[in-house]
């Protein structure tokens, strides 16, 4: 395409939606195989396909936006709407877990001992590691905002520092969460408490890992001078996503760790 008379991006044919769908099929099938038959072959294949797809798809998007100029102001507006709708869909995704938790905890059945936490469950102390995790994520929210404001002001050094601090705090949170899982006295098999706790906090942990990956990509891009004060939607989307992850954790902490204990 040599000439166009509009500001929209006519996307070229791409194999990545197909390979992405294939990787999703392999990962979900692989999880079932791992749970039931203790075989990790399909899961590993799905993860490998997913990583390769993500890398090559992001590479294409970066090339189209940064080097080929396809992301005009109209295209960026559409991407903003898309990111907002994606975050709204994530809100409903986590709402299901909160619904399951409150449905079980507000009116505990006789099978649970008529109390919450259920008989025999020793919940984690909300004033120990969970409170530290809350502080870590709140601090990361401050540092990502600092990075964003620095970018808007054209201060590249401070932007990189703020982004590096945010990524470090995200990795630290993930390690703390992993240690908490390792030391917990209950498992995902321990009735409705174990299942709601590990599914809700586990999916949040997965979102922290995804958000950290998103921010690492932004950090590497900024090292190559991809973002300017007026053209940086990739970073803005990552910041929105990170703030969403922060807010979800606050609800998890208040509901499951503090009130639920």
Swiss-Prot record:
Membrane-side (Mitochondrial intermembrane) residue stretches: 35-40, 106-128, 184-190, 257-261
Keyword Translocase: yes
Topology versus the membrane: Multi-pass membrane protein
Cited SUPFAM superfamilies: Cytochrome c oxidase subunit III-like
GO BP, one annotated term: mitochondrial electron transport, cytochrome c to oxygen
Similarity field: Belongs to the cytochrome c oxidase subunit 3 family.
Function, as annotated: Component of the cytochrome c oxidase, the last enzyme in the mitochondrial electron transport chain which drives oxidative phosphorylation. The respiratory chain contains 3 multisubunit complexes succinate dehydrogenase (complex II, CII), ubiquinol-cytochrome c oxidoreductase (cytochrome b-c1 complex, complex III, CIII) and cytochrome c oxidase (complex IV, CIV), that cooperate to transfer electrons derived from NADH and succinate to molecular oxygen, creating an electrochemical gradient over the inner membrane that drives transmembrane transport and the ATP synthase.
Name of the protein: Cytochrome c oxidase subunit 3
């Amino acid at each position: 395409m040599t000439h166009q008379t509009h500001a929209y991006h006519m996307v070229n044919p791409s194999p990545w939606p197909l390979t992405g769908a294939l990787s999703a099929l392999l990962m979900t099938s692989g999880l079932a195989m791992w749970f039931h038959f203790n075989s990790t072959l399909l899961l590993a294949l799905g993860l490998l396909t997913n990583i390769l797809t993500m890398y090559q798809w992001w590479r294409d998007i970066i090339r189209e936006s940064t080097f080929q100029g396809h992301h005009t102001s109209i295209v960026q507006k559409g991407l903003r709407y898309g990111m907002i709708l994606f975050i709204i869909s994530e809100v409903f995704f986590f709402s299901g877990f909160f619904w399951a938790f409150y449905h079980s905890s507000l009116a505990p059945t006789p099978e649970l001992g008529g109390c919450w936490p259920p008989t025999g469950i020793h919940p984690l102390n909300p004033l120990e590691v969970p409170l530290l995790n809350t502080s870590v994520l709140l601090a990361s929210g401050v540092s990502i905002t600092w990075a964003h404001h620095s970018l808007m002001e054209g201060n590249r050094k401070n932007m990189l520092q703020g982004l590096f601090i945010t990524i470090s705090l995200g990795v630290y949170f993930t390690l703390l969460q992993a240690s908490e899982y390792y030391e917990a006295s209950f498992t995902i098999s321990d009735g409705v408490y174990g299942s709601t706790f590990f599914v809700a906090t586990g999916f949040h942990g997965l979102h922290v890992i995804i958000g950290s990956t998103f921010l690492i990509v932004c950090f590497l891009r900024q090292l190559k001078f991809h973002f300017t004060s007026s053209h940086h939607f990739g970073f803005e989307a990552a910041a929105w996503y990170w703030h969403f992850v922060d807010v979800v954790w606050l609800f998890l902490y208040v509901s499951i760790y503090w009130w639920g204990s």
